[in-house]
């Protein structure tokens, strides 16, 4: 009889502990939903000027611990990490190139990360666009990337733009960032980004991937050559292939 009582007491303790843990999980889920809700409120900010980043002069103990493996690199060091924390990058295109670019910039500790894309997540994206998930099919790609990166590094400021860049909004958005990363597969957008970066005096890093090949080029660095310098006129539409038509392998 005493043995049965002990077992019942242990069972009750386990039930109480399980109930406690479930309550903690529910609280964490509510906190996560609230954070993601706050993040989603930033998707319509095309006319809103971003506040300047809060300048960091030294690294916190937490930052030193987080970034310790890259801090020991003489090419980066504490000075480089502080510069990174005080810098901003705008990624245009939240697909196969935008996803890995975003996750590594976030992990490295960039101060502000903007993500521009007009599209929503589709099932056909998931084999290569690694920050999107099955349960986010139908969500805006920019929001999906911001959500994933926020879970990786909440110390970075994420600014998702669910829109298509055009001649009206490109310059106001681009002007607020230090560097622009072109991760699109659209020739017209490449020329638009190039022209806006030249006007705004921003460096443009341009990447492309098709089938089994990839390219990476830096334009307008310290007033160097731009994309239009190399290709003054856009190619005929029938000569251009994108990922939807030509395919792309899902391995970086």
Residue ranges, per PLM feature:
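Adenine nucleotide-associated cytosolic modules
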Residues: 2-252
């Amino acid at each position: 009889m005493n043995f049965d009582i002990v077992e019942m007491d242990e069972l009750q303790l386990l039930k109480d502990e399980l109930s406690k843990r479930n309550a903690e999980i529910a609280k964490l889920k509510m906190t996560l939903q609230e954070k993601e809700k706050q993040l989603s409120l930033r998707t319509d900010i095309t006319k809103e000027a971003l506040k300047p980043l809060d300048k960091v002069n030294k690294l916190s103990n937490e930052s030193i611990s987080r970034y310790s493996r890259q801090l020991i690199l003489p090419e980066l060091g504490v000075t480089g990490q502080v510069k990174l924390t005080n810098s901003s990058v705008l990624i245009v295109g939240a697909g196969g190139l935008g996803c890995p670019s975003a996750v590594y910039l976030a992990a490295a500790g960039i101060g502000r990360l903007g993500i521009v894309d007009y599209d929503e997540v589709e099932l056909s994206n998931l084999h290569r666009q690694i920050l999107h998930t099955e349960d986010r099919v139908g969500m805006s790609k920019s929001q999906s990337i911001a959500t994933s990166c926020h879970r990786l590094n909440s110390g970075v400021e994420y600014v998702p733009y669910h829109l298509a860049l055009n001649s009206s909004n490109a310059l106001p958005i681009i002007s607020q960032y230090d560097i622009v990363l072109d991760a699109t597969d659209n020739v017209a957008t490449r020329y638009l980004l190039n022209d806006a970066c030249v006007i705004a005096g921003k460096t443009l890093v341009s990447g492309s991937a098709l089938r089994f090949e990839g390219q990476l080029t830096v334009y307008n660095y310290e007033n160097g050559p731009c994309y239009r310098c190399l290709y003054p006129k856009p190619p005929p539409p029938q000569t251009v292939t994108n990922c939807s038509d030509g395919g792309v392998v899902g391995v970086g």
